């Protein structure tokens, strides 16, 4: 398993793995990378290098999931990335799939029960996914951020308490 590191040119990685383009877009990185390294691009976009590399390497390597490292990242970093991922699927991918599927179904012979079933399955899946995304945005993400803030407050109180001992 070959991992991306800070000294590699990001354009080389994208050339080999074009499916990475939507992932780097979520970090505000657009094509036209030139010969800049991952480190250069992270500095330019004010990105946490470790978080960026962890996301990229997790995406590219099925067996790579650094659970301990993920636990070290600030909750807001993770929530921001997941929010952008949700937006990508709800605003781009789902409408694109729906448009192509609808076109395919409308161009096919009438009374095809298999296509009708596929259409129903997709609509059901889309509704479930959009509902999950809505729950993330309204409940789960705010809860995670609030919990993180409370933990931070507790840690600050512990520090204050130690200072007075």
Give the residues covered by each predicted segment.
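Small-residue-biased structural context
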Residues: 1-164
